[in-house]
Amino acid sequence: MLIKNKYKHSMFPVNQNNIIEENEEIKFDLIDTDIEIPFNYLTYILNSTSYITPEILFDGFKVVLPFYQDVQLKPLFELAFDQDVNINSQNKDNGCTFLHYSVEDVKVLYDNIPQFLLEKGADPNIQNKDGNTPLHILINRDFFSSKEIYVAKLLIQYGADIELKNLLGWTPIQCFIQAGNIKLKALLQLVKACKDNDFSKLDITTKDIKEFLDWQISITPENSKFF
């Protein structure tokens, strides 16, 4: 059985349990599939190569089991960064960065890869070929939980521009209108109010004040520059 990899021109021999058994990589030319790669792909890469490329890192986001991202993708990134791989490298096909991929895939998102990348210096305002930033991608997800809200907060705290437009002319706030998550709306409204130093459209209640504190959003003009 051969498993195709979406981002790299290669296939890996695997057994019936979807595990790579042979230390061999088979090159091929046609590639355009969403089939997930084998369970032990990251271990295979760490043990078989000393040089990590951006393409290998993009591959890592397709690992089948969620815990593998947390346990093995981070060491892969650490090794790559030690080799001066640019944390803001973009996929040549779609323009997405590692941060874009980390907020798109629920399995990676739940293993705190977005926070890890932001702490390492990932730029939250890089746009892919559709003009979407990681915040656009996150807001357009079909499912929202407290984790997604937390990651949205992180993106904003690390400088995500809530009014940056994609190629359709939509800002993350306008994308929210399609997503319709109430908590996300509250977060974006609070951030915009801080940025504009205009709270006239907000009904400041006890709950709103708690959210200011929880999200560490300052209402003082001198701190609005951080947004």
Curated annotation (Swiss-Prot):
Position of the signal peptide: none
Source organism, top-level taxon: Bacteria
UniProt keyword annotation of Repeat present: yes
InterPro entries given in the database record: Ankyrin_rpt (IPR002110), Ankyrin_rpt-contain_sf (IPR036770)
Start-end of each ANK repeat: 94-126, 130-164, 168-199
One Pfam family recorded for the sequence: Ank_4
Keywords, comma-separated and alphabetical: ANK repeat, Repeat
PROSITE patterns: ANK_REP_REGION, ANK_REPEAT
Entry protein name: Putative ankyrin repeat protein RF_0314
